[in-house]
């Protein structure tokens, strides 16, 4: 058989193969188990040693040429497929880019930052405190007796373990413990708000086991209930961006203030039109609490208030169900973006 003809036939067959399957079939004709070159190599055993050596060298050279042609065609077909795929996946860089949605603050966090901003403008500092608190700071220091119902496990989340002084740990039920903590490390006059997470065993449309609260405290030598009324009314006007707000202070009871009052606000429009709605608890700081701060209650007096940030957010935006703030429903949250 003419070896040069085998090379020519293989090169032609490979070049005409339009896809990988056809190319592999043509490869079998020349290099397969029954291929032309394979048959020639099998026949070398019938030749005498000298002829076998020379013919074997010629056949191996031809085999290398055929394999080279096969490799070249494989690469050419691979290049064609790659170019086709690149063309199909090509990106037109002149097209406008895809917009990415910008994140935004949660509505309760918007209220949190707004409250901080307003109180900073009237001279209040902003402090933070531990969410895992001792029962002494959470209850005892705030004039809550040992048998107070708020101390029961039906109202408070207790934590296994005690602090270094052997006091029971719990998840704070309000931010009020920071009244005593802050006053013990700062000297009067004390003007501070403490926003933060708090926890109670409660869950319905208007209550959550975890909620955010802001505590306010002003301690000095001549602070009166009139100061409380002025500060909180001014805050509400700025928060709701209205000057015609009507506020009333309704007598109430809290163990850590005396006298105590619920702060109500009259709504004139919207779903709450004509209703007085509770906004905050407040009062003048109880002398026992002043004493636990390390201060002389005969010299220092002050007021405190505690407002729910979710409550303020619901009233500002007209949200009826507190649980919407915690369900992570983007359809709801996007309204505040």
From Swiss-Prot:
Coiled-coil stretches: none
GO CC, any one term: cytoplasm
Gene Ontology terms describing biological process: phenylalanyl-tRNA aminoacylation
One Pfam family named in its UniProt record: tRNA-synt_2d
Entry binding sites for Mg(2+): 258
Manner of cofactor binding, per the entry note: Binds 2 magnesium ions per tetramer.
Keyword set includes Protein biosynthesis: yes
GO MF annotation list: ATP binding; magnesium ion binding; phenylalanine-tRNA ligase activity; tRNA binding
Cofactor(s) needed for function: Mg(2+)
Subcellular locations according to the entry: Cytoplasm
SUPFAM superfamilies registered for this protein in UniProt: Class II aaRS and biotin synthetases, tRNA-binding arm
Documented EC number(s): 6.1.1.20
Catalysed reaction, written as an equation: tRNA(Phe) + L-phenylalanine + ATP = L-phenylalanyl-tRNA(Phe) + AMP + diphosphate + H(+)
InterPro entries linked to this entry: aa-tRNA-synth_II, aa-tRNA-synth_II/BPL/LPL, Phe-tRNA-synth_IIc_asu, Phe-tRNA_ligase_II_N, Phe_tRNA_ligase_alpha1_bac, Phenylalanyl-tRNA_Synthase, tRNA-bd_arm
Keyword Magnesium: yes
Key words, A-Z: Aminoacyl-tRNA synthetase, ATP-binding, Cytoplasm, Ligase, Magnesium, Metal-binding, Nucleotide-binding, Protein biosynthesis
Family: Belongs to the class-II aminoacyl-tRNA synthetase family. Phe-tRNA synthetase alpha subunit type 1 subfamily.
Subunit structure: Tetramer of two alpha and two beta subunits.
NCBIfam families: pheS
Name of the protein: Phenylalanine--tRNA ligase alpha subunit
Native organism: Paraburkholderia phytofirmans (strain DSM 17436 / LMG 22146 / PsJN)
Gene designation per UniProt: pheS
